[in-house]
Amino acid sequence: MTPRLDMIGLVTGDMAASLAFYRRLGLEIPPGSEEQPHVEVTLPGGLRIAWDTEEVVRSMDPEWTRPTGGQRREPAFLCDSPAEVDALYDELTAAGYGGHLKPWDAFWGQRYAVVLDPDGCGVSLFAPSTPPTPSTPSAPSTPSA
């Protein structure tokens, strides 16, 4: 059997603040989840995302400490267009979330930005810099006479 990625787990110091942030990014998280120490949702396509409070993590691993410095993880959200990257970045920073990298046209062909979730972890927002063009099927080749 080949292992497959099934779930991404996030540790949070403030469940309500974290869930509010990810709801703003379009994740459908059931109402009332803020009161739970562990929350899981299944995304379209089957991948699950889960949040655990720091207390839950410490109950499983008493030596766990909150990471400091650098990014340990960075979820990335695909936006529909470069304009949506800019608008979502502006919306989130206006709502008080930290902006880490303002939207810019990255050399790898994306409009790219990074905001900070309530725990200070980076969350990428990106879209192709230019919309993909539909491919035109090539004409069948004909043998030379």
Report each predicted region and the residues it spans.
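Conserved active-site tyrosine of GNAT-family acetyltransferases
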Residues: S18-Y22, L92, G120
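Amphipathic alpha-helical segments
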Residues: D14-I29
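Conserved beta-strand-loop-alpha-helix junction that forms the acyl-donor binding cleft
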Residues: T12-M15, F107-W108
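Short glycine-/small-residue motifs
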Residues: G122-L125
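Acidic active-site catalytic centers that drive phospho-/nucleotidyl reactions
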Residues: D14, D117-D119
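Vicinal oxygen chelate
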Residues: M1-M7, E28-P82, D86-L116, A127-P134, ...
